[in-house]
């Protein structure tokens, strides 16, 4: 079946927006031009002047299945991804059970094939049960379909354990993806160790809790030659460590979340658990350093750390509620409105940070809008302004600090392998 998307616009190879029509056949892009022959298509879709982009890639998502289906499932999480314009996501392993054996990884891959709306890359755990005491069988997990290795949700506390993990990963040409948190410094914290924590008498998580862990790991990465990736970087000290490591030629990459780019602890209105995430919202100076790191290439791409929880869990109060917020359905509108329309990023930079940049970091054949590429495509309305309403989310999680924020840049159609998997108004 041949589909033509007509009356669109996209970036050409020189980074200039131009009129675009695009043909999809057998799951791939087969033609791009300013005017294609509609009679050659089985279906013609008029995108009415909207932006045609390669589908977004999110390499940090919690789909919660198995074991956390009250929060999210592979089906609901990937439909939320499609609604947000994401055509590929990577699923974190802090599920129950953890994908730490060949059999569990095979089960997970089968479940993904059966229920996912978008492409899902499954992470395997670094340690058995994510307990930090015994390494998993990396070779068997890779053979079973693991994308990379991480214990995200907790940091690997033992330097010796991480050193051995990096050696094994390097031998398999696989990445170690790290949640960086030194438990001896975390101090039972629930928010950043700053003015907000002090005002409300809350335990704080100091910046050094993260940066010390990263500093340790980049030296281990240098010693092993492993590709080491830093999850959800959040402090100015961490940015400095990663910048120095890159200058030294160490194979390190890093991601940042939309919420750490847009919010700081000064923005928290009170002890509201929808502002509780790990790492926490840091200082204004940290947020500015993250933006600077994104602009100078220290930080490689943006990932949401989509972390759905039930309403009941988030109503337990800021001390008892779990860490995490949702992000798949709001990431692009928030970033477009508050970084592009404010001239911090260009539209081309933002799209690259959500497409080609994550693909390049992990060697994925994704993220490009070109003839011969897989037809993973999102269509974006850059003009219509709407307020974020958690009750309209297709994710089971409604936990967001951005409720009521007015944004432009809403995805309206998402194609995965040439198949229309989500369209606004046809939910």
Curated annotation (Swiss-Prot):
EC number: 3.5.2.3
Record-listed Zn(2+) 1 binding positions: 60, 62, 152, 305
UniProt keywords, alphabetically: Hydrolase, Metal-binding, Pyrimidine biosynthesis, Zinc
GO molecular function: allantoinase activity; dihydroorotase activity; zinc ion binding
An example Gene Ontology CC term for this record: cytoplasm
Pfam families documented for this protein: Amidohydro_1
HAMAP family for this protein: PyrC_classI_B
Function: Catalyzes the reversible cyclization of carbamoyl aspartate to dihydroorotate.
Protein name, UniProt field: Dihydroorotase
Species for this entry: Geobacillus sp. (strain WCH70)
């Amino acid at each position: 079946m041949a589909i033509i998307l007509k009356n669109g616009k996209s970036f050409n190879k020189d980074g200039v927006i131009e009129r675009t029509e695009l043909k999809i056949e057998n799951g791939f892009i087969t033609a791009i031009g300013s005017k294609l022959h509609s009679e050659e298509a089985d279906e013609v879709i008029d995108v009415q002047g909207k932006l045609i982009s390669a589908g977004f890639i999110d390499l940090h998502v919690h789909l919660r299945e198995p074991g956390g289906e009250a929060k999210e499932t592979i089906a609901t999480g990937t439909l939320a991804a499609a609604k947000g314009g994401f055509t590929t996501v990577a699923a974190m392993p802090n599920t129950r059970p953890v994908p730490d054996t060949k059999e569990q990884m095979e089960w997970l891959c089968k479940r993904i094939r059966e229920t996912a709306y978008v492409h899902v890359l499954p992470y395997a755990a670094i340690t058995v049960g994510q307990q930090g005491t015994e390494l998993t069988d990396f070779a068997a997990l890779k053979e079973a379909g693991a994308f990379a290795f991480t214990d995200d949700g907790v940091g690997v506390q033992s330097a010796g354990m991480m050193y051995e993990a990096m050696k094994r990963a390097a031998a398999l040409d696989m990445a170690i993806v790290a949640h960086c948190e030194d438990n001896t410094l975390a101090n039972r914290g629930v928010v950043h160790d700053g003015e907000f924590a002090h005002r409300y008498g809350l335990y704080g998580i100091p910046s050094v809790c993260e940066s010390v862990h990263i500093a340790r790991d980049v030296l281990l990465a240098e010693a092993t030659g492993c590709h080491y990736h830093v999850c959800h970087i959040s402090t100015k000290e961490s940015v400095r460590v990663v910048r120095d490591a890159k200058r030294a030629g160490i194979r390190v990459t890093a991601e940042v979340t939309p919420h750490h780019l847009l919010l700081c602890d000064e923005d928290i209105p009170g002890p509201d658990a929808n502002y509780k995430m790990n790492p926490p919202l840091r200082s204004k100076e940290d947020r500015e350093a993250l933006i600077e790191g994104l602009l100078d290439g220290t930080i490689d791409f943006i990932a949401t750390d989509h972390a759905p929880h039930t309403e009941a869990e988030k109503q337990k109060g800021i001390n008892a509620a779990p860490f995490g917020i949702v992000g798949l359905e709001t990431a692009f509108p928030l970033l477009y409105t508050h970084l592009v329309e404010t001239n911090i990023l260009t539209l081309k930079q933002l799209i690259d940070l959500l497409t080609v940049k994550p693909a390049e970091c992990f060697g994925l054949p994704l993220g490009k809008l070109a003839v011969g590429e897989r037809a993973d495509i999102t269509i974006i309305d850059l003009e219509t302004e709407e307020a974020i309403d958690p009750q309209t989310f297709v994710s089971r999680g409604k936990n967001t600090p951005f409720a009521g924020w007015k944004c432009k840049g809403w995805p309206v159609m998402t194609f995965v392998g040439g198949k229309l998997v989500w369209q606004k108004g046809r939910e």
